[in-house]
Amino acid sequence: MAHKKAGGSSRNGRDSKAKRLGIKRFGGELVSAGSILVRQRGTPFHAGENVGMGKDHTLFATATGKVSFSIRGAEKRRFVSVEEIQS
């Protein structure tokens, strides 16, 4: 019975690629319809006015306008909205 483990079999060496999550457009920025505002896992940010949510919880603008962030409700939820600009 060997008392030393055979060399050359490391159990390390794996890592996952970064997912590039986070806020993509900040408050006050002008965005066009379809622009991605936030990439997230779950819903740290909720969809407000003129904002849609994709199946992976990505928030995107449904209208052209200015991005705004707000905290609303008893649960103090963070909402992302787009204030529509009339053109």
From Swiss-Prot:
GO terms for cellular component: cytosolic large ribosomal subunit. Gene3D superfamilies: 2.40.50.100. Keywords: Ribonucleoprotein, Ribosomal protein. InterPro entries: Ribosomal_bL27, Ribosomal_bL27_CS. One of its GO terms (biological process) is translation. It holds the Pfam family Ribosomal_L27. One of its GO terms (molecular function) is structural constituent of ribosome. Belongs to the bacterial ribosomal protein bL27 family. PANTHER family: LARGE RIBOSOMAL SUBUNIT PROTEIN BL27M, RIBOSOMAL PROTEIN L27. This is Large ribosomal subunit protein bL27. It comes from Dichelobacter nodosus (strain VCS1703A).
